[in-house]
């Protein structure tokens, strides 16, 4: 009887230990499904500015909310870099490559010079899995750029993943500055971005 009790005790401990290992490995397993490359499919730009619903970024006379098509319509096209997710145990980082229109102040001209220059910046978004098994990211608040004249980059902030699955990652950029040729002014807006697995 005593031996039977000991066997039951050992089996209980083994089962508990196995359960603990399963919980620990599950978070790592969830993240491992995201490993690989992603590309931007769509960038939906919106603003709270009154009477502005679209933006004419490429100066063709037609406004759009599709920021990706506006960027691709610029004369100096930029290489769209693929984003990549890498994992280390139960944490991972999505190295998110975001195209940003960079504007420069011109000392000889009052205000800004709407020189079209598109930079691709790397945003490291750190991913974890919460207790409900949902993938979350930290809020990336602000890029620290030493060049005070780079207006577009200075105003890029509040970036986070709002929804994630292994085949699609949705990212929101809280502040994304654009120069609208229709109104001839800088407009602060937000962008929802769809990343698709390559």
Protein language model regions, located:
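Bacterial Sec-dependent N-terminal signal peptides
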Residues: 2-3, 16-44, 195-198
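Bacterial N-terminal signal peptides
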Residues: 8-15
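Short, solvent-exposed loop/hinge segments that bridge or flank secondary-structure elements
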Residues: 35, 39-98, 143-156, 179-180, ...
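Edge beta-strand at a domain terminus
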Residues: 155-159, 164-198
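Contiguous, well-ordered beta-strand patches that form the walls/edges
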Residues: 73-168, 196
């Amino acid at each position: 009887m005593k031996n039977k009790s000991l066997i039951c005790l050992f089996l209980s401990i083994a089962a508990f230990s196995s359960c603990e290992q399963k919980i620990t490995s599950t978070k790592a397993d969830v993240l491992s499904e995201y490993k690989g490359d992603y590309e931007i499919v769509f960038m939906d730009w919106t603003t709270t500015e009154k009477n502005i619903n679209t933006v004419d970024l490429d100066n063709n006379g037609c406004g759009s909310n599709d920021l990706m098509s506006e960027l691709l319509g610029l004369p100096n096209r930029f290489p769209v870099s693929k984003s990549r997710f890498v994992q280390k145990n139960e944490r991972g980082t999505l190295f998110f490559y975001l195209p940003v229109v960079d504007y420069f102040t011109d000392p000889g001209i009052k205000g800004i010079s709407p020189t079209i220059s598109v930079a691709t910046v790397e945003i490291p978004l750190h991913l974890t899995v919460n207790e409900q098994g949902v993938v979350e990211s930290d809020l990336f608040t602000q890029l620290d750029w030493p060049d005070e004249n780079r207006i577009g980059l200075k105003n890029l902030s509040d970036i986070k993943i709002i929804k994630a699955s292994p085949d699609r990652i949705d990212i929101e950029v809280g502040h994304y500055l654009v120069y609208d040729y229709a109104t001839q002014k800088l407009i602060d807006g937000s962008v929802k971005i769809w990343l698709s697995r390559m």
